[in-house]
Amino acid sequence: MFYETLKEICQKKNTTPSAVCLAIGISKSNVTEWKKGRSPKLDTVVSIANHLNVSPARLIPKKEEP
């Protein structure tokens, strides 16, 4: 899930998902939606990745094989 991956990366970078939202200029309410399982738009993923200095692919959870 996107939120879990984001949270893990944020912990390693000593920040929070809410702080990242504020830094890139989007509403903190997005965090609540991500916690519910929604995924952000691609441009948001890219902005978050740039802010955290990670690859956008790192933020996108891999699909589990059946």
Predicted segments, located by residue:
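Residues within the alpha-helical elements of helix-turn-helix
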Residues: K12, A23, H51
